[in-house]
Amino acid sequence: GKPEFPAADGKGMMYDNIEDKNEIVRLDAASKTLTATWALSDCESPSGLAIDRAKGRLFPVCDGGKMAVVDTGTGKTIANPAIGEGPDAAGFDPEHQLAFSSNGDGTVSVVDASGADYKTIESVTTEKGARTMAFDPSNGKIYVVTAQFGPRPTATPDNPRPRPSILPDSFVVLVLSR
């Protein structure tokens, strides 16, 4: 499979999305063994992954405008809150109990993780393509990056899905805070 993004629970377990199989795997870091494989029935192409270590919850972000909330002990999906389209990264703020995803449609989706409902509470407008994200828990800031793109090249047999080039001097870092 295609591992996408790991998350550690701080107790010796690692979790990773397997993007092409719509799965999450759990690995024991000390013994270097696979201890569980869980199918994500309502989560297609999971990419980013965040973890709530205290509650034992994983937050994979999925194509189709969904985030899954998964129990780290059982692999059971608890909720599927709505997020923006084209997600890439996930984050979790343990102080404010918020899960979030950065989305290619130019949004950051914010999910309330304080209770059992896991409802989307906000969609913050960023810029189209701002999918790569980092969260700094020391200051509560979210950083997303993007750039402006030129026209998409014509597809060829050797490159059936060409990517457009980035326009010079167009790279930006956007900083989001409460």
What are these language model-derived features?
Residues 1-178:
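Predominantly soluble domains enriched in secretory-pathway, periplasmic, or organellar proteins
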